[in-house]
Amino acid sequence: MILDSINYPKDLNGLNSDELEVLSSEIRSLLVDTVEKNGGHLGSNLGIVELTIALHRVFDSPNDTILWDTGHQTYVHKILTGRRKEFTNLRLPEGISGYPSREESPHDWIENSHASTVLSYAHGLASAYSLSGDKRRVIAVIGDGSLTGGMAFEGLNNLGHSGKKVTIVLNDNGRSYAPTISRLSESLIRIRSNPTYMRRQHRLEKLAEGMPWVGEILERGISATKAAIREMFEPPAFFEALGITYLGPFDGHNIEEIEQALSNAIEFEGPVVVHVLTQKGRGHAPAEQDSIKHMHDTSGMKSGSYTEAFSEALVKVGESNSKVVAITAAMPDSTGLLSFRERFPERCFDVGIAEQHAVTAAAGMAMGGLRPVVAVYSTFLTRAIDQINLDVGLHELPVIFCIDRAGVTGDDGASHHGLLDISLLSK
């Protein structure tokens, strides 16, 4: 197996395209075997195999700083950075963490399971390197789902304003925990699903294959034409307006194409977005066909669990009181709201990865006479303490918080523990 010879990122450099394709398949097999046994996040990691390989071939980690937003999609990164042999112990006692861990490896810069933070880390690191004269590169990998979070927009705004040299890799699979809630994501979907653009791109590629004698001149012309066609349908106006160069979209499962895009991004001064289209659950039929989560988290909601009991109770309460509404921050399944949403779709609100907005929106609903129920993980609730304290508590509003995954949660490491809820919420 080729994978047996990959102990560190430098081992990727001597592989040809055929070997890289085989390696991708071997990594997917290891992911499926391990995650189906130990639990964890399968779909997101199956979708990022080629992108991760390309990142580690183009950049020199850990000298170049590769940062991962949320962190649940770093299994391939772990495999390629010296933890291949330990990977079968993922999320087990004395095994490796399900999220990045600074204790595990110098390749893991930030320990995180909270979304939308990576661009702020990137801005800070790039600022530090600039002041010290350090030439190392900063790369921030963020999903389209994480771009629904307000902190991500704050990071984009500051990167564009400062002009710091950061490569932002937008991993666009069209999904996070649930269908992505965002007007920006809707724009990205229009790019990935526009049939005219896709047909013309395919025809241009076929034309190039049929006339190899034209060579590099035709290739450059076709690239420019493809870019023009793309921009007719969805100009990268959003990023450009912030002062950030936009490149893409690119096929996230074509290693050569990704490597070329990343290499091009390095040549620009200032921040650059490299928009990469990937398929969540790639190469594993059960994950590809899981329309709810694409096997985001294989542990799921167990029969007889507190989450299941809450789910059933909320539906009953909703049936008896039409003023009861439910709010989730991009996690309707994990927090037990799918049954309520199916029964009362107009009374279930998914606000995207935006816990602060969820809480204050609930406050507004309560002011308007509704009885909002905010379903949220304990670890994510702490992101909205100010809103709970002032927007709900100070106004003495009838908002109910149903807090899941409280206490020491174990498998996914320190950033997923729910240890602060009681102390922060007590009077």
PLM feature spans:
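N-terminal amphipathic, basic-rich helices that act as targeting or association modules
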Residues: 1-81, 238-262, 268-276
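Cofactor-binding active-site loop characterized by glycine-rich and histidine/acidic residues
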Residues: 41-162, 324, 328-329, 337-338
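Non-catalytic terminal/interface segments that mediate subunit docking, oligomerization
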Residues: 65, 270, 278-382, 387-389, ...
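Acidic, glycine-rich active-site loops and adjacent beta-strand->loop/helix elements
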Residues: 70-75, 142-148, 170-176, 280, ...
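Short acidic, glycine/serine/threonine-rich loops at helix termini
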Residues: 76-82, 123, 147-156, 178-183, ...
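A glycine-rich helix N-cap at a beta->alpha junction
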Residues: 84-100, 161-178, 196-199, 349, ...
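A short alpha/beta connector and helix-capping loop motif
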Residues: 149-171, 181, 185-192, 371, ...
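Long, well-ordered, tryptophan-enriched scaffold segments
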Residues: 173-309
